[in-house]
């Protein structure tokens, strides 16, 4: 029986991992957030992993406030980079497998075809740079480390784009949304399913990409959210990125090539609209 540590358990992905754990009773779980384990405390991490004889670490914790990260560089770096190094070292010391969740923000977003794992990284934000540093720490300090980059994550838990667009769609007559940033939404439950598939088969070290299938803009995504949520009174208007400036630069193109993870682990990935429908049906609003 494997002992699995899942950090960031109160976040979107951590909560989805908890929900799906009921489908995998063969494992013993340790779901932690900062109250149970401060992953920025290296000794605490080492002690926890050793004491509980952890076999797999899934790090769902991260500083994800992309714009605030531009000002809170130290805190962002501590959580997204330093803490990943601590977890990786602890995994290596305990001969455990380590799954680190990363992001499309490690790329500059200037591509026109889906990013493969081998594409050069070039982050344009503090968030992206710290997440890339975390990737490097994971692969340097743990021989059984696997990076899964994802993008545009949403779920029924916490605050996210889907829930925000539903709320604003009910509050406003019109809404402006960016149409020239292209990517693929990722339902956190689908990512959690993929992670459990990896755990079941065993980590194969390296970098992988995962999002749902298909491509859309934030504008397209919003239109689909409103259609599936039955919101008809709010007019959604397309905006250029330049019309909505933000402290952190966003990738204009962040579609990820998922061929590697599908081939390596036999994972079938739903299209984003199918998963969005599943999520919205699960929401109470």
Regions found by a protein language model. Give the residues of each.
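N-terminal Rossmann NAD(P)H-binding glycine-rich loop of SDR-like oxidoreductase domains
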Residues: 3-20
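Rossmann-fold cofactor-recognition segment
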Residues: 30-41
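NAD(P)H-binding glycine-rich loop region in Rossmannoid oxidoreductase-like domains
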Residues: 42-79
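NAD(P)-cofactor binding segment of oxidoreductase domains
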Residues: 71-99
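Catalytic helix-loop patch of NAD(P)-dependent Rossmann-fold dehydrogenases
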Residues: 78, 83-86, 106-148, 153
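NAD(P)-dependent short-chain dehydrogenase/reductase
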Residues: 136-183, 189-190, 196-197
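Mid/C-terminal beta-alpha module of Rossmann-like enzyme folds, strongest
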Residues: 194, 201-247
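Conserved C-terminal active-site "lid" loop/helix of NAD(P)H-dependent oxidoreductases
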Residues: 217-223, 240-279, 283-284
């Amino acid at each position: 029986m494997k002992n699995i540590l899942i950090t960031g358990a109160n976040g979107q992905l951590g909560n989805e991992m908890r929900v799906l754990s009921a489908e995998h009773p063969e494992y013993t779980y340790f779901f932690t957030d900062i109250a149970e384990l401060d992953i920025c405390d290296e000794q605490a991490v080492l002690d926890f992993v050793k004491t509980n004889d952890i076999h797999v670490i899934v790090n769902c914790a991260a500083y994800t406030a992309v714009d605030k990260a531009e000002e809170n560089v130290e805190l962002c770096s501590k959580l997204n980079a330093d803490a990943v190094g601590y977890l990786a070292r602890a995994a290596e010391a305990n001969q455990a497998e380590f799954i680190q969740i990363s992001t499309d923000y490690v790329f500059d977003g200037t591509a026109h075809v889906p990013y493969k794992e081998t594409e050069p990284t070039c982050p344009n934000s503090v968030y992206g740079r710290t997440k890339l540093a975390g990737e490097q720490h994971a692969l340097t300090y743990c021989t059984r480390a696997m990076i899964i980059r994802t993008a545009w994550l949403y779920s029924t838990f916490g605050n996210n784009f889907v829930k925000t667009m539903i709320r604003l769609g009910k509050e406003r007559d019109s809404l402006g949304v960016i149409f020239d940033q292209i990517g693929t939404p990722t339902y956190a439950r689908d990512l959690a399913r993929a992670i459990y598939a990896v755990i079941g088969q065993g980590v194969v070290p390296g970098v992988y990409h995962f999002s749902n299938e298909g491509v859309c803009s934030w504008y397209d995504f919003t239109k689909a959210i409103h259609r599936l949520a039955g919101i008809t009174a709010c007019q959604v208007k397309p905006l250029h990125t330049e019309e909505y400036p933000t402290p952190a630069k966003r990738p204009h193109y962040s579609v990820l090539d998922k061929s590697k993870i599908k081939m390596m682990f036999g994972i079938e990935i739903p299209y984003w609209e199918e998963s969005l429908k599943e999520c919205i049906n699960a929401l109470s609003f």
